[in-house]
Amino acid sequence: MNNSGNQNINKKVFLQAKYFFLARLLQVIIVFGILILFSLRLSKENYGLYQGSWVFINLFAPLLFLGLPQQLLTLPGNGAISHFFWLLKKYFPYYVTAVLIFITTLFFLHQKFSIALLICIFICTLFQSVMLLMDNLVIKLNADLLFLKQNFLYSLLFLALHYAWLYAETDMEWLVVGIAFIGFLKSAAYFLFIRKLNLGVHLEVADTLYFEKQWKLLSLNEILNRFTTHADKLAIIFLLSISGFSVYYNGTYELPFFAMLVSALGNSLSVQLSNNNTGAKSAAALFKQSIVTGSSVAFPLFFFFYIFSTPVFQFFFNGKYMDSVPLFFFSIFIAFLRVLIFAVFLQVFKNNHTILFGSIIDLLVNIGSVVILYPFLGIDAFPAGFVIGTAFQIAYYIYKTKKLINAGIRDLIPLTWLLALIVALTLFYSLLFFILQPLQTWAIIGIAAIITTAIIYLLTHFFGSKINNKKTVTSLEHE
């Protein structure tokens, strides 16, 4: 592919990533704000019920359609709808089985959650699952502005619903049903849009054996990933009281800023690389560029939240959840690893079996680490095991990606940039914490947050952009 072609892809990738980022930004801010508000206003028991409900919704909503939502992003651009309906019809019995497994899982929680709340969780999960499916389908159809508008409207309704529920002081069931309803409204709007399009629903599906194989691999991988991500919280719900779970949840809450950034870059890369005949070296250069961009945002945020973790918990939770800080020390390290989105690269180049095996490694190492560390760390072993398992998974992905495109690690990862950034930020934030320590908590957080924002701006608009342009152009010229 020539330089102009790759430059067009680069521009489209990061323009689309901007839409994804903006679409998620308001929702992330609102969810984070609700977490803070509910932590302060609700009892630990009620807060645990609320977040426990979301654990099951977030775990099972992507699993009810198994690997279909993620596979939508890699289907052929001119036949996404026909492939979607073909997969939906062919594997309908599997989706029904997933629903039955979900119902069985909820049944074992009747001693900690009321039957009425469990029914509401089930209904909400169904609507959230459909919403996720429609979200990815709209992304695949490149309806970026519609995606942005609908997510903006959904976020506002989500906030209004929580605000009304908090001041109405009614049962948790009403809140969960309300979330299900606004999810239904969003999905209905997407459906009406797609229905108006002439997309060749009845086009013949080519290479059915390939798509069947990919669906199976993605389904297994989705199950493993979701279980690995939420297994610790499931275990804590059964092991501890609901109040104890609320402490664990706040300590291991994965800051949405990291997930949002990775999701935006990952979805955009997946869509653009699958829609264009991009060579391996060009894709590697684009991938390397995304790591520089991602680390320019994620690393300053990591050091801010890690170095200033105690003041952060004191300020936002008013000292109520200080028991969560030791858990946070372990779980925050996942931010370093999230930037390395090798699974996206492997998926685009049809290596889903590698992704699946990496997920198996992640799960086994995670469980093994928890078993080994639990006698020494207690419940802190759960977030530590999660980070260790993810590290082994990414190491495996790096090894397989190098073999796939016959490239060195420096062709994929900007090692010099990452190392220099880590050292510089470690020294800077350590010094900043020492300087700000005598101040009041609100002043410490405010000043550190402003400085972190400035650092991110400088990295993304000056240093990161220069490295991106230089490395990407050089790589493409030698292709």
Where are these regions (language model features)?
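Membrane-water interface segments that mark the loop-to-transmembrane alpha-helix transition
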Residues: 15-28, 53-116, 280-301, 358, ...
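Membrane-interface junctions at transmembrane-helix termini in multi-pass inner-membrane proteins
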Residues: 74-81, 127-150, 332-361
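N-terminal membrane topogenesis motif
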Residues: 1-30, 71-73, 81, 145, ...
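Transmembrane alpha-helical segments of multi-pass transport proteins
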Residues: 97, 101-108, 116, 168, ...
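Signature of the first transmembrane helix
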Residues: 9-69, 158-159, 179, 183, ...
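Interhelical loop/hinge segments that connect adjacent transmembrane helices in multipass membrane
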Residues: 1-9, 13, 119, 145-150, ...
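Helix-loop junctions and terminal segments of transmembrane helices
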Residues: 31, 35, 62-80, 140, ...
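Hydrophobic alpha-helical transmembrane segments
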Residues: 148-196, 360-368, 379-402, 444-456
